[in-house]
């Protein structure tokens, strides 16, 4: 069984994969992870391009588009690893990005999921809108992230470099203990 599997769900994202997958393959495989692309019934050239340009990437072929949650649920039935990262196809990763996540999870067996800080691809000094630095719920039930509240995105000045408990981790870069994911029944297919 692999230690870490990085799984990217794709639907007609040939150009996006061609742009962002090189960093994922390079820096994930360097840290011993296995990279998967779960194709959600694409009708573009995604699968042919992946086979031709990324031979080390493991392909999971789903016959039709099952959406985000069910697409991942079906794909992860075909993955055996201690940890799985659900990673959006438009994420560029950096060297050793998996190391602190795996080290944290190894040391905290009570934790089922975590996430890295996510910075904007276009403006690397700012947080990304999707997930930023961990999710919370305010006292009125409104979800927000460290680094992004409503439409305001903060500059990353190291203010969120500490590890803290979060209420939710973003699906854009969700690092999960696969056994816990399966025990919980996976993602809710209604979303």
Residue ranges, per PLM feature:
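Glycine-rich, basic loop-to-helix element that forms the pyrophosphate-binding segment
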Residues: 61-79, 89
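Short aromatic/hydrophobic "clamp" motif used to bind/position activated sugar donors
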Residues: 84
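A recurrent flexible, glycine/aromatic-enriched loop bordering the glycosyltransferase active site
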Residues: 139-144, 150-176, 183, 190-191
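Cell-envelope/extracellular polymer assembly enzymes that use nucleotide-activated donors
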Residues: 3-5, 34
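Short, acidic, metal-binding catalytic loop of nucleotide-sugar glycosyltransferases
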Residues: 22-32
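Short beta-strand/loop segment that forms part of the nucleotide-sugar
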Residues: 32-41, 60-62
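Conserved donor NDP-sugar-binding/catalytic core segment of glycosyltransferases
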Residues: 92-142
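A conserved acidic beta->alpha catalytic loop
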Residues: 23, 39-48, 64
């Amino acid at each position: 069984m692999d230690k870490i599997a990085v799984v990217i769900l794709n639907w007609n994202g040939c150009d996006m994969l061609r742009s962002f997958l090189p960093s994922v393959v390079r820096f994930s495989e360097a840290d011993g992870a296995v990279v998967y692309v779960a194709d959600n019934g694409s009708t573009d050239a995604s699968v042919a391009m992946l086979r031709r340009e990324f031979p080390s990437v493991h392909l999971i072929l789903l016959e039709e588009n099952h959406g985000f949650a069910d697409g991942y649920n079906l794909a992860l039935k075909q993955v055996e690893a201690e940890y799985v990262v659900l990673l959006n196809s438009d994420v560029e990763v950096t060297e050793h990005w998996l190391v602190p996540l795996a080290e944290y999870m190894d040391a905290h067996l009570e934790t089922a999921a975590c996430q890295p800080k996510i910075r904007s691809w276009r403006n690397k000094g700012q947080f990304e809108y999707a997930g930023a630095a961990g999710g919370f719920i305010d006292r009125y039930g409104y979800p927000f992230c460290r680094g992004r509240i409503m439409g305001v995105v903060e500059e990353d000045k190291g203010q969120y470099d500490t590890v803290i408990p979060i209420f939710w981790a973003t699906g854009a870069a969700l690092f999960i203990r696969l056994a816990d994911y399966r025990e919980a029944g996976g993602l809710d297919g209604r979303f």
